[in-house]
A protein has these predicted regions:
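Bacterial N-terminal signal peptides that target proteins for export
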Residues: 2-12
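Bacterial N-terminal signal peptides
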Residues: 11-20
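Short glycine/threonine-rich turn/loop motifs
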Residues: 54-74
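Short Fe-S-cluster ligation motifs
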Residues: 69-89
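Sec/Tat signal peptide C-region and signal peptidase I cleavage site
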Residues: 22-26
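Sequence/structural segment immediately N-terminal to covalent heme-attachment motifs in c-type
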Residues: 28-51, 56
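Solvent-exposed, acidic/flexible segments
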Residues: 30, 34, 49, 81, ...
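C-terminal capping alpha-helices of c-type cytochrome domains
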Residues: 84-127
Length: 127
């Protein structure tokens, strides 16, 4: 291997790594996300009111545990996490791994489903 090829290989490797860790919701389908939200999330959550889980309107940029009239677990209240595409993706993939001791007992295993749900939630910021 030529020494001239090393910078190219490093650049390609870095680009591949960045693509692999980019938020999955960047190209999410918000309409499909609405359908997924209505079939998977609505039993516990609502966009505008607290239910078993906290409301979701305004979730982007909000600190985890930040809805004042919802009774969060101490783990969530003390987590210091701020919700964005990456943290929501990690949360939906495995809430207990992100915040041990939290109360949500549901996971979304498919990355494309998480991305679509996140795109739907993000769109609610505009409505």
């Amino acid at each position: 291997m030529s020494i001239l090829n090393i910078p190219c290989r490093v650049a390609l490797g870095a680009a591949a790594l960045l693509a692999a860790i980019a938020p999955v919701s960047a190209g999410g389908d918000s309409e499909r996300g609405r359908t997924l939200y209505e079939s998977r999330c609505i039993a516990c959550h609502s966009i505008d009111t607290n239910r078993v889980g906290p409301l979701h309107r305004g979730v982007f940029g909000r600190k985890a545990g930040g809805v004042s009239d919802y009774d969060y677990s101490p783990a969530v209240k003390n987590s210091q996490i701020v919700w964005n595409e990456t943290t929501l993706d990690r949360w939906l993939a495995n809430p207990e791994r992100l915040i041990p001791g939290q109360k949500m007992g549901y996971q979304v295993s498919e990355a494309s489903d998480r991305g679509d749900i996140i795109a739907f939630l993000k769109k609610q910021m505009q409505n």
